[in-house]
Amino acid sequence: MRTEARGGERRRGAGRPRRLGGSMIAAALVAVVLVHGTARAAEEGATPHEPSKFGADWQSWHANTNVTDMPSVQRGARNFVSYCLGCHGLKYQRWSRLGTDLTIPADLLQKELLPPGDKLTNYIHTSMPAKDAETWFGKTPPDLTLMARARGPNYLYQYLKTFYVDPSRQTGVDNLRFPSTARPDVLSELSGMKRAVFRDVMAKGEGGQSVHQQVFDHFETLAPGRLSDSEYDGFVRDTVNFLDYVSEPAQAARRALGVWVVLFLLVFTWLAWLVKREYWKDVH
């Protein structure tokens, strides 16, 4: 009886390596799906909104960045140099790295993007002195190298799309994403001038009392810009896409390498399971 009991325990234990191996393979498959899905989601983003329909849903607008879209990143670099570099720098990024990653020849980079007197080996700095900037704007414009990682591409996209005329502000404009911003709307020649229309709503304040609140409703165009709504939307997406790349230049390579690493682990797990099964076959 004791021998039979032990034999039964061995038979029950013999199935454990198989179940364990199956679980390991299943876990590896799930990991592959998650990594692939995350990379795709990061590249594709959410469904874009219709740029001509400005409304109260601005907080759900998505940049839909894709740093592997090289033409978009290249256009974004051009946009940044033309409209942003005068105030904002990229102090952790070199011109040479920019040219290499964006496949821009050195002579073309020197001709089209580099400021006069700058070198390819230099970091990308703004020419505006920090003290002068603080005097003019009340604070020094931030460096944008890591802004996309700190705030997220969607934040930058919404910020650049929600400027509106406000005569009470020193710069003449304000922003929905960043109220009381010190930044002037340097892109108004492209986007045009818009007025924000707010509506009164009743809300509960302190002590449960009803209070009036101003809630954004929609934009009204006061003066058209050089670009149509869809063209300006593409301009902003390219610019944000470039800043997303700058925040982590190796992210495209990292995602591609990550898939191969997970596949390697999957194959290694399967081989390890085969060895384990062969080993336990002799034991049982």
Language-model-derived ranges and their functions:
Residues 43-46, 50-78, 89-100, 247-255:
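Electrostatic cytochrome c docking/interface patches
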Residues 26-34:
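Bacterial N-terminal signal peptides
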Residues 257, 268-284:
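Juxtamembrane interface at the cytosolic side of transmembrane helices
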Residues 224-258:
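Short, aromatic-rich amphipathic segments at membrane interfaces
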Residues 4-26:
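Bacterial N-terminal signal peptides that target proteins for export
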Residues 37-41:
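Sec/Tat signal peptide C-region and signal peptidase I cleavage site
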Residues 103-207, 216-232:
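Electron-transfer interface patches adjacent to heme c in soluble/periplasmic c-type cytochromes
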